Amino acid sequence: MRCLTCLRLSFKPLCPNCLNDLPLSLKVRVLEGVSVYSFYAYSEIEELIKSKYALIGSRILPLLFQKAGAEFVKILQEKGLNAPLYGIAIDDKIKSFYSHSAALLKGFCQGNLKPTYGRLRANNTISYAGKSLEFRANNPRNFTFKGDKNLDYFLLDDIITTGTTLKEALKYLKTLNIKAHFAIALCSADE
């Protein structure tokens, strides 16, 4: 196999050099009183994140999130947060042979961060890609939760643009008295 960016021989779709060359730029936004952490600038990984629409994305996206997850676990450990936190990928339904959000969750969860799958699903499956804020507001996801309401959770999504999906998910979990300590996004489109 060859690295998709430099075309050198590699066992993974991104060689270690190219992966290390992608700078982490931790950003924090607050939605519904919850901190949302993102790790890359959208412009830096735009072509890579678009791989989520193809099967190769199941190999590329976890590499990006493994790097981010390792850095985030260090931050949690420095703050003394070692209790288990359970990740919920937003709407991890299988599309195009895999679930990109479940692949991201698997790549991100390390140390005391544990993945949970199939917990938060959207009943409305309309795609928000390239749609206006008005369209997003008029077509809510209408989430359903299946899981243990007593665990401590964090949410995970691929891109945060307007924050509509994360806001809706956080509001919904709040109505169920489910604690989401923070949210994670691979990248933020508001550079």
Language model features with spans:
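Short cysteine-rich clusters marking metal-coordination/redox-active sites
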Residues: C3-C6, C15-C18
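Short functional micro-motifs and their immediate structural scaffolds
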Residues: S10-F11, P23
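Active-site-facing substrate-recognition patch
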Residues: P16-Y86, I94, L120-N150, C187-E191
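A structural signal for isolated positions on well-ordered beta-strands in alpha/beta enzyme cores
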Residues: Y86, F154, H181-I184
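Glycine-rich phosphate-binding loops at beta-strand->alpha-helix junctions
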Residues: A89-S101
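Histidine/lysine/aspartate-rich catalytic loop segments that bind and position anionic ligands
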Residues: K106-S127
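A phosphate-binding catalytic loop at a beta-strand-loop-alpha-helix junction
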Residues: L155-A169
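PRPP-dependent phosphoribosyltransferase catalytic core
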Residues: K167-E191
